[in-house]
């Protein structure tokens, strides 16, 4: 399973750490990544605010699941755009 984790804060680090332990994970992509997250996956250098780049990259890389940390990214319409593209989304609020 290919997962894209959006965000680079402490919440996303905790999520990324756990996702990276999954036996079904093939690749963990990070948007944008951070010094703490980067060892867990593949940093893409995409801003968490760049909805177009997140959606386009998800389609290009055949991402199975997008996990979003920042609420601002969701408020900007990422959930709707991913749904239109047929990509699963996990909304995590801790």
Predicted regions mapped to residue ranges:
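Conserved small/polar residues in nucleotide/adenosyl-binding loops
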Residues: 92-94
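N-terminal beta-loop-helix "entrance" segment that forms/cooperates
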Residues: 30-49
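Glycine-rich adenosine-cofactor-binding loop
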Residues: 5-12
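Glycine-rich beta-strand-to-loop/alpha-helix junction loops that act as flexible
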Residues: 8, 32-33, 69-71
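N-terminal glycine-rich "phosphate-gripper" loop used for MgATP/nucleotide binding
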Residues: 44-83
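Structural detector of well-ordered beta-strand residues that form the stable sheet scaffold
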Residues: 29, 67, 88-90
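Extreme N-terminal starter segment of soluble prokaryotic enzymes
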Residues: 1-3
């Amino acid at each position: 399973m290919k997962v894209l984790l959006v965000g680079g804060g402490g919440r996303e680090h905790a999520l990324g750490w756990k996702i990276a332990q999954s036996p079904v994970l093939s690749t963990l992509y990070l948007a944008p990544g951070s010094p703490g997250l980067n060892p867990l996956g593949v940093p893409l250098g995409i801003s968490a605010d760049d909805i177009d780049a997140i959606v386009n990259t998800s389609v290009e890389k055949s991402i199975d699941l997008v996990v979003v940390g920042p609420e601002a990214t969701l408020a900007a319409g990422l959930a709707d755009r991913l749904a239109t593209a047929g990509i699963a989304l996990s909304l995590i609020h801790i």
